[in-house]
Every structure is written in structure tokens, then in C-alpha cells.
């Protein structure tokens, strides 16, 4: 049997590194279909830190796409698992037959599914991508994204799968030792990416709570984002006093980020799509409820796991937030499907499906 090849077709260092390390640490030892990767980006020590993997790096999207298409044409039994498919050339290859449906398996990350960009080239490309998506052999995604995808592509097979968030299961009870009282601290957004709509989110928080809460905005990723960070800072200072606004412009190490989250009382995410599942997982693990846009279908995954969900359209106050905290504190976090290690079973099944080992 031909070994499955995994494709990270865009240079998204943080997410690509997370996927590679997860495969190296959790999957490669038990499956030959978890070892071969084609990745856009620089090595930057990844080969050394992932010795169980065979990783081929490419300088750009086009060079990787050309290599994938060549492999697909040379051997029609070769199957590919695309993780977060942001590479237009690969969509066009699927649409034109360069890659066959039986060769194309896609793990939806969220941003690669929704049509939120307003630029002309995106508006021209989206209809073509939609046509190509009808030809995918199987999609893997969160429950909410599967539901969203099925509305337009009901005939494409869908399987539940969660991004492998880096988590320590021993911290599932860490919320129990924190006393929550006094001024609330609210985390706004999951990164410095513009998709978080930071300014609109800050205005929404201010409309709900006024200048009575402390707002923390993590913007250390992506790099070279100083102009946008300053734009958010100025907008924030028009709404909140300086002591109540904390803009984090430096990237935090994982342990420091965990410590930051533990100081929060609420996460506030205004974006109208599924994204930031890593931050949501870590907040929920710490017993911190999240406010979501109703258009973000991840609320379906949360309710399926019997977790409280607050919405941006709700009338929020401290009593409501504290009640959601109480409900989270009483939830059995060891059974949550999108937590580590529970998502591992889904990955093992996904590998078997994509490799053709199970129907």
C-alpha cells in the first residue's frame, strides 16, 4: 500500500509546528501513514525536533503544489491529507483533475472554509473553490464546521476531527483552586490577527460592561504587526482607562500564556467563524467561559459536550459570567471530545480513512 502523504500547503509556522510535533510525538510510532510530510516554509530546526517524521520543505505555495500535483499524476493510488488547505493551486488541481477526489482528504481548520475576505481576487476565486470542494474525497472538521460544510456540499463525506491543541490533561482541574471575585478580567481575541476584529470586540465589551473590567488583548502573533497593534491600542484607550487595558505585543511562551489565561474570568471572541480552538480549549480547561458570535458554529461542539456557551448578543453581567464559571467548574473535563488525549482517537480513525485502510 502507498504511504499517505500529509500536506501543509501554506507557511503558517505556529500551526504547522504544532501539527508536526503532534504527529511526531503521538502518531508516527504506531502508523506508517503518519510520517511523510510536504510543508511550505523553512525547516528552522523542525527536522531535528521531529526525528520520527520525513519532512520535505518548499519555499512557497506554488513549488509545493507543483510537487504534489506531479506525485498525484505519477501514481493515482497516492493519497494526500491536506491540513488547513489555503493553497489555491491545489484547489484548482482538484477541480481540473490534476488531483483526483480519491486522492484528496482535507482537514478543515476554519479560515480555509469561510468566505470572509472582501478582496476582488478572493471574490473571483471563492466560486471555483466551492466547486472544487464538491470533489473532496472526505473532509474532517469540528461538528460545527461539518454542519456548515454540509449545507453546500451534502454529498461529501464528513468525519469529526479536532485540531491537536497542545494540552496537559493533568491541568483539567486547575480551575478549582482559583477564587473569582472583584473586577473581572476579559481576554479579547486569540492572537493579533485582524480576523479577531479587535476594535469591534473592544467596543462590544465596553457596551456590555463599560470601563468596569480589565481587558487583556494578546497580539504577540503574528510578527511585524506594530501598526495594527497601535491602531487597536488607540481604539482601546478611547474606551477603557489605561489601567484597564493591557495590550500584549510580545509573543508569550506556552507556560506564560497559560498563566495569563488563569488570571482571566471570561474570553470574548467576536469572529463569525470557527477559529482559535486552541485558546478556547485552554480557557475551558481553566474553567473560564467563552463568549462566541452566533455565526461561529463551534458553539455546536460546546453544547454537544454539555458546556455553557455565552453569545455576543446576550445581555451579559457579572452574575451571568459567574454562573457560567460555576457550570464549567462542575463539568467533567476528562470527557471533553476536543481535549487531549481524547482527540487522539479521531486522528487514528482519520489516518485509517485517508490511507484507505477502512471504508
UniProtKB/Swiss-Prot annotation:
One of its GO terms (biological process) is enterobacterial common antigen biosynthetic process. Keywords: Cell inner membrane, Cell membrane, Glycosyltransferase, Membrane, Transferase. It is a peripheral membrane protein. One of its GO terms (cellular component) is plasma membrane. It holds the Pfam family Glyco_transf_56. It comes from the Bacteria. It is an enzyme of class 2 (transferase). Pathway: Bacterial outer membrane biogenesis; enterobacterial common antigen biosynthesis. InterPro entries: WecF. GO terms for molecular function: 4-acetamido-4,6-dideoxy-D-galactose transferase activity; fucosyltransferase activity. Its main location: membrane. Its EC number is 2.4.1.325. It is found in: Cell inner membrane. It catalyses: beta-D-ManNAcA-(1->4)-alpha-D-GlcNAc-di-trans,octa-cis-undecaprenyl diphosphate + dTDP-4-acetamido-4,6-dideoxy-alpha-D-galactose = alpha-D-FucNAc4-(1->4)-beta-D-ManNAcA-(1->4)-D-GlcNAc-undecaprenyl diphosphate + dTDP + H(+). Belongs to the glycosyltransferase 56 family. Catalyzes the synthesis of Und-PP-GlcNAc-ManNAcA-Fuc4NAc (Lipid III), the third lipid-linked intermediate involved in ECA synthesis. This is TDP-N-acetylfucosamine:lipid II N-acetylfucosaminyltransferase. It comes from Shigella flexneri serotype 5b (strain 8401). The lineage of its organism: Bacteria, Pseudomonadati, Pseudomonadota, Gammaproteobacteria, Enterobacterales. The gene is wecF.
Amino acid at each position: 500500500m502507498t504511504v499517505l502523504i500529509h500536506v501543509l500547503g501554506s507557511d503558517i509556522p505556529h500551526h504547522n509546528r504544532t501539527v508536526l510535533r503532534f504527529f511526531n510525538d503521538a502518531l508516527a510510532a504506531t502508523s506508517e501513514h503518519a510520517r511523510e510530510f510536504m510543508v511550505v516554509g523553512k525547516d528552522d530546526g523542525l527536522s531535528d525536533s521531529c526525528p520520527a517524521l520525513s519532512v520535505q520543505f518548499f519555499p512557497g505555495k506554488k513549488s509545493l503544489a507543483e510537487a504534489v500535483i506531479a506525485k498525484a499524476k505519477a501514481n493515482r493510488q497516492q493519497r494526500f491529507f491536506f491540513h488547513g488547505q489555503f493553497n489555491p493551486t491545489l484547489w484548482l488541481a482538484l477541480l481540473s483533475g490534476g488531483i483526483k477526489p480519491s486522492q484528496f482528504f482535507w482537514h478543515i481548520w476554519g479560515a480555509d472554509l469561510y468566505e470572509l475576505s472582501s478582496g476582488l481576487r478572493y471574490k473571483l476565486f471563492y466560486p471555483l473553490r466551492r466547486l472544487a470542494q464538491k470533489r473532496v474525497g472526505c473532509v474532517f472538521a469540528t461538528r460545527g464546521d461539518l454542519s456548515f460544510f454540509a449545507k453546500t456540499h451534502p454529498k461529501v463525506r464528513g468525519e469529526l476531527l479536532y485540531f491537536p491543541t497542545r494540552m496537559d490533561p493533568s491541568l483539567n482541574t486547575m480551575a478549582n483552586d482559583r477564587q473569582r471575585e472583584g473586577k473581572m478580567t476579559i481576554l479579547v481575541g486569540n492572537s493579533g490577527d485582524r480576523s479577531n476584529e479587535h476594535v469591534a470586540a473592544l467596543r462590544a465589551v465596553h457596551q456590555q460592561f463599560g470601563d468596569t473590567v480589565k481587558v487583556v488583548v494578546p497580539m504577540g502573533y503574528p510578527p511585524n504587526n506594530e501598526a495594527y497593534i497601535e491602531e487597536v491600542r488607540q481604539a482601546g484607550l478611547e474606551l477603557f482607562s489605561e489601567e484597564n487595558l493591557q495590550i500584549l505585543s510580545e509573543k508569550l511562551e506556552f507556560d506564560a500564556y497559560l498563566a495569563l489565561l488563569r488570571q482571566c474570568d471570561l474570553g470574548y471572541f467576536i469572529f463569525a467563524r470557527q477559529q482559535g480552538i486552541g485558546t478556547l480549549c485552554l480557557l475551558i480547561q481553566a474553567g473560564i467561559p467563552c463568549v462566541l458570535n452566533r455565526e461561529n458554529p463551534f458553539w455546536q461542539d460546546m453544547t454537544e459536550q454539555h458546556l455553557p456557551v455565552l453569545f455576543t448578543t446576550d445581555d451579559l453581567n457579572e452574575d451571568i459570567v459567574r454562573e457560567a464559571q460555576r457550570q464549567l467548574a462542575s463539568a467533567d473535563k476528562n470527557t471533553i471530545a476536543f481535549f487531549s488525549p481524547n482527540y487522539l482517537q479521531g486522528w487514528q480513525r482519520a489516518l485509517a480513512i485517508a490511507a484507505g485502510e477502512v471504508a
